[in-house]
């Protein structure tokens, strides 16, 4: 199995933008990368405002939104609760089997969870249980401001306690006027967790284009460090890029 599992310290911290942007950059580099978000609540997969649509747009993958996200619910709740209220049951094996099916099309997959690692996910699993099934290195997306050191260090400790590898942290939504504090938070996270902060992604105000996001990712995220993980797993694109 190859790729990354993108998780976060909380919801609405920029996880989807980070996942889509990194996938898009890797595809530009020639890697046969796909994106996968098994469960989505808050929007159905086809909604252009939803995460699946944003992942498709930023990454440039050929798969459709309902293939990127096979299980989606309109109600904005934790996925397990949203599915339960809608009378639907999704099990861990289903989303893991779907992942394995996507690997027939892509050499690597960037998988986005929902919220943080302890979120109730499928009927029988938390997000972290899914991450453990895949055994992909984690990218933790976090806020850059007050409270992020505690949340990020706890997330990393929880992941490590469950035997997961954390590739790095990306602080998302960094504003120029706050950069001194952001830099201090970055250094503290690295010191306390032993995990590198691989990027300080700027805050995107209003509407933004794919090109703007990908260029920002190239400038502000250490793509080469992430590339080492893919190469070490012998997953440089051997199939044609799509």
Curated annotation (Swiss-Prot):
Residues reported to bind ATP: 12-17, 51, 112-115
A GO MF annotation of the entry reads: ATP binding
- Amino acids binding substrate: 41
Active site residues per record? 37
- Pathway of this protein? Cofactor biosynthesis; biotin biosynthesis; biotin from 7,8-diaminononanoate: step 1/2
Mind telling me which residue stretches traverse the membrane in this protein?
none
What is the E.C. number? 6.3.3.3
Q: Name one GO cellular component term.
A: cytosol
| Keyword presence, Magnesium | yes
Cofactor dependence:
Mg(2+)
Checking InterPro entries in the record gives:
DTB_synth_BioD, P-loop_NTPase
Give the GO biological process terms: biotin biosynthetic process
CDD domains the UniProt entry points to: DTBS
Give me the residues that bind Mg(2+), please.
Answer: 16, 51, 112
Query: Family per UniProt?
Result: Belongs to the dethiobiotin synthetase family.
According to its UniProt entry, what is the function of this protein? Answer: Catalyzes a mechanistically unusual reaction, the ATP-dependent insertion of CO2 between the N7 and N8 nitrogen atoms of 7,8-diaminopelargonic acid (DAPA, also called 7,8-diammoniononanoate) to form a ureido ring.
Please give the subunit comment from the record: Homodimer.
Q: What is this protein called?
A: ATP-dependent dethiobiotin synthetase BioD
Name the species this protein comes from. Bacillus cereus (strain ATCC 14579 / DSM 31 / CCUG 7414 / JCM 2152 / NBRC 15305 / NCIMB 9373 / NCTC 2599 / NRRL B-3711)
Q: What is the lineage of its organism?
A: Bacteria, Bacillati, Bacillota, Bacilli, Bacillales
